[in-house]
């Protein structure tokens, strides 16, 4: 008789890193004091996980889809719809959605892609640039800090267009270009929209006041990752188990909603450095009594990596580890996996193609000789897998896997 367990998958966003001189040529994970994750590594099964496949610089969206059992090469159609659905924006068939950032444009060049992580007046800015142009309706909703989503409704919209985001500072916003002849009219209307809203944002009272106070304005909307809602089976239909998520990032809430998973909110659990780690873990443990599978995402490690702050990333890992302690008493009924969705090295300040460490922890599995949870120790572990393998392994360890063959 196989014991059936619940599953908790904890994704520490952008966890993987590279050695830094400031940390004595160690990674933040190596330098951090994290006895609870080390305990799980010493009792569990560890190794390295490649996001998507070796050498791929995956996005958080594609890697999370893969971790949830969906091949992004088949199902991914852009992150825009996830952002919009995560902010409770309605999307009809044919609508086009984008990820968006409020940014700072000075003399035609982007000097800050996040407008100083603007976090006040965002709703007013979003409302001001929600306008109609002819037969096209543009709706913007603000998210966490500088982030927002844009949904466009109108005839014959195509997602085969480029981004306006130059993806680095010191460059002008890119004109929207069609990537297919059928997208010519979409590119044209998007360029017209971006032109009009620059004037609105430039003179908006929120930005005028920010400049008076010595703050940089959110006077540009950078858009990227255009997409329409994909035709995709629910998490339960595809995997045969019920699912829930405990996440702070709106786009990830949107993905989970799209997949029919329950979205459980936790007070103070935002997709930022200042998040309620303890609340997330305790909520996930409680949710595992009602759902077969619970996804937890903690964004803070990725934020520190993008900021290039080794010490902050080390401290964040230590704070997260404290919140992990209650999991150590649940191994008889829960299978826990801890990993990253990708690496965000502080030296790169962006995603890289490096593998990330992973640990599986529960009663009744064999353990390897690894005693520490970090990138280098994981090289000696039992596993060399990709994100696409993770759910299969979790299902098997939880006694939920279907037999392949007779």
From Swiss-Prot:
Keywords: Glycolysis, Isomerase. Gene3D superfamilies: Alkaline Phosphatase, subunit A. It is an enzyme of class 5 (isomerase). It comes from the Archaea. Residues 160-174 have a biased composition (Basic and acidic residues). Its EC number is 5.4.2.12. GO terms for biological process: glycolytic process. Pathway: Carbohydrate degradation; glycolysis; pyruvate from D-glyceraldehyde 3-phosphate: step 3/5. Residues 156-183 are annotated as: Disordered. The keyword Thylakoid does not apply. It catalyses: (2R)-2-phosphoglycerate = (2R)-3-phosphoglycerate. GO terms for molecular function: metal ion binding; phosphoglycerate mutase activity. InterPro entries: Alkaline_phosphatase_core_sf, ApgAM_prokaryotes, Metalloenzyme, Pglycerate_mutase_ApgM. Belongs to the BPG-independent phosphoglycerate mutase family. A-PGAM subfamily. Catalyzes the interconversion of 2-phosphoglycerate and 3-phosphoglycerate. This is 2,3-bisphosphoglycerate-independent phosphoglycerate mutase. It comes from Thermoplasma volcanium (strain ATCC 51530 / DSM 4299 / JCM 9571 / NBRC 15438 / GSS1). The lineage of its organism: Archaea, Methanobacteriati, Thermoplasmatota, Thermoplasmata, Thermoplasmatales. The gene is apgM.
């Amino acid at each position: 008789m196989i014991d059936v367990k619940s599953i908790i998958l904890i994704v520490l966003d952008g966890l993987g890193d590279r050695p830094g001189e400031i940390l004595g040529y160690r990674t933040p994970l190596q330098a951090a004091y994290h006895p609870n994750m080390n305990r799980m590594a010493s009792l569990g099964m560890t190794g390295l996980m490649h996001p998507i496949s070796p050498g791929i610089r995956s996005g958080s969206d594609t890697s999370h889809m893969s971790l949830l059992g969906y091949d992004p090469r088949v199902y991914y159609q852009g992150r825009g719809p996830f952002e919009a659905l995560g902010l409770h924006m309605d999307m009809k068939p044919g609508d086009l959605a984008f990820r968006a950032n409020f940014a700072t444009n000075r003399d035609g060049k982007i000097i800050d892609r996040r407008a100083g992580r603007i976090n006040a007046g965002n709703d007013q800015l979003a409302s001001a640039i929600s306008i109609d142009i002819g037969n096209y309706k543009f709706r913007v909703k603000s998210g966490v800090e500088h982030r927002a989503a844009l949904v466009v409704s109108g005839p014959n919209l195509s997602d085969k267009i480029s981004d306006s985001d130059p993806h680095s500072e010191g460059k002008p916003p890119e004109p929207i270009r069609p990537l297919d002849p059928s997208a010519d009219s979409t590119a044209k209307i998007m360029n017209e929209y971006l032109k009009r809203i620059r004037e609105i944002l430039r003179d908006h009272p929120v930005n005028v006041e920010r400049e008076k106070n010595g703050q940089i304005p959110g006077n540009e909307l950078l858009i990227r990752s255009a997409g329409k809602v994909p035709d995709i089976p629910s998490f339960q239909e595809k995997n045969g188990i019920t699912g829930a998520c405990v996440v702070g990032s709106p786009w990830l809430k949107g993905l989970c909603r799209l997949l029919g998973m329950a979205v459980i909110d936790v007070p103070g659990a935002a997709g930022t450095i200042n998040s309620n780690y303890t609340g997330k873990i305790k909520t996930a443990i409680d949710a595992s009594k009602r759902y077969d599978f619970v996804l937890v995402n903690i964004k803070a490690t990725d934020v520190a990596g993008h900021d290039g702050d080794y010490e902050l990333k080390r401290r964040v890992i230590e704070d997260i580890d404290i919140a992990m302690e209650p999991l150590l008493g649940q191994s008889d009924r829960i299978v826990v996996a801890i990993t990253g969705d990708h690496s965000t090295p502080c030296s790169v300040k962006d995603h890289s193609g490096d593998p990330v460490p992973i640990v599986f922890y529960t009663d009744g599995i064999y353990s390897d000789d690894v005693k520490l949870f970090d990138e280098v120790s994981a090289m000696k572990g039992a596993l060399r897998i990709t994100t696409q393998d993770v759910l299969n392994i979790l299902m098997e360890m939880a006694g939920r896997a279907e037999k392949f063959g007779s």
